[in-house]
């Protein structure tokens, strides 16, 4: 980690200089009130969101939305963007190969997502204790939250590489991508939506299988197959955008 100058720059800007602290403040200042209000205010739905039994669901879904959204923005360098060296400068002036730049971006994204979940952990664990959620379900939730936040944010890295010199284009893409994908997954096939899938797991409900070519495909297999394809496409697109930008 110490030998990668690109990664070290991101760590210095976010944690040494403190430019990234605002991200974690935003996450906590939104998550904490939602959790407390969902416990003490009247329920929104008597069957799904009633009282303490659903507290962990509310907290987990809110954490999912916040971590995915802010991870995409961090990957897109929307915080303290003026402090980061450009990709071309790293490649041409500092001699950093494309692989090292991509590796540093992915490692820092992993670090950011892990830290975000670590900060949210006390609230999630407290909600799980009140809702009497089994430890195995809590551990599975943390794994899914990391998987979704990291996977979706890789498209932020793609936007950064493709439109590095056009900050407004990147910001519009990230926000449009986030909301469009959420809505489309609800309309096309509900189990593909991470919110619906997470709620189904926490509620111990199973989606009906999808019949394709005379074979019934389990919803879980379709969900993870679709997401692995989605994330794999993002990683390939990120590499392609880096090569395109750095070879101009």
Model-assigned labels for residue ranges:
Residues 1-86, 98-248:
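Hydrophobic alpha-helical transmembrane segments of membrane proteins
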Residues 94-95:
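Glycine/proline-centered hinge or cleavage motifs at structural transition points of membrane proteins
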């Amino acid at each position: 980690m110490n030998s990668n100058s690109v990664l070290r720059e991101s760590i210095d800007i976010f944690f040494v200089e403190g430019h990234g602290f605002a991200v974690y403040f935003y996450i906590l200042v939104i998550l904490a009130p939602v959790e407390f209000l969902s416990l003490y205010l009247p329920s929104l739905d008597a069957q799904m969101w009633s009282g303490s039994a659903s507290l962990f669901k509310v907290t987990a879904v809110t954490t999912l939305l916040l971590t995915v959204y802010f991870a995409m923005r961090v990957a897109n360098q929307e915080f303290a963007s003026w402090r980061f060296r450009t990709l071309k400068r790293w490649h041409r002036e500092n001699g950093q190969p494309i692989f090292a730049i991509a590796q540093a971006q992915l490692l820092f994204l992993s670090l950011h997502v892990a830290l975000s979940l670590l900060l949210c952990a006390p609230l999630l664990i407290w909600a799980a204790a009140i809702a009497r959620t089994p430890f195995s379900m809590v551990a599975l939730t943390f794994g899914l939250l990391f998987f979704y936040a990291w996977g979706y944010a890789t498209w932020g890295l793609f936007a950064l590489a493709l439109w590095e010199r056009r900050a407004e284009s990147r910001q519009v893409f990230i926000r449009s991508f986030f909301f469009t994908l959420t809505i489309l997954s609800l309309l096309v096939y509900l189990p593909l939506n991470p919110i619906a899938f997470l709620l189904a797991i926490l509620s111990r409900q199973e989606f009906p299988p999808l019949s394709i070519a005379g074979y019934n495909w389990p919803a879980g297999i379709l969900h993870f197959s679709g997401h692995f394809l989605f994330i794999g496409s993002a990683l390939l697109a990120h590499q392609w955008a880096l090569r395109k930008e750095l070879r101009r």
